[in-house]
Design a protein with these regions (language model features):
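Substrate-binding clefts and catalytic carboxylate motifs of secreted carbohydrate-active enzymes
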Residues: 1-109
């Protein structure tokens, strides 16, 4: 089984309140993962979070913009993956989606 988690896209963290909604995004992500782990357990299938992400602070796309909230969100997700791996649950791993990557964003937003 695989899941995606996009707190901004799903309305858990509006672009003008990313830092303020970080805890809500974490809590909703945990609930979403746990719900899908229950389904994975029912069918005895591993669960992979194949795609997730969190925007840069202030919804900026510049490579030099701050990523404090995103770093905190990623740490939370990676800690969940590590905790589940240590407990030998069906949560098999994750990938993350890199916003900005090698592309050069337009300064026109």
């Amino acid at each position: 089984m695989n899941i995606h988690i996009w707190p901004y896209n799903w309305g858990w963290a509006p672009k003008d309140r990313l830092q303020e909604n970080l805890e809500k995004a974490k809590q909703n992500s945990k609930v979403y993962i746990d719900e899908h782990l229950a389904v994975a357990k029912k069918y005895q299938k591993p669960l992979v979070m194949e795609e997730f992400g969190y925007p840069r602070d202030n919804f900026q796309f510049s490579k030099s913009s701050s990523v404090k909230a995103r770093d905190a969100y990623y740490k939370y997700i990676f800690d969940l993956v590590l905790d589940n791996a240590s407990s030998h649950t069906l949560f098999a791993g994750c990938n993350f989606w890199g916003w900005g990557g090698f592309a050069n964003p337009s300064e026109r937003i």
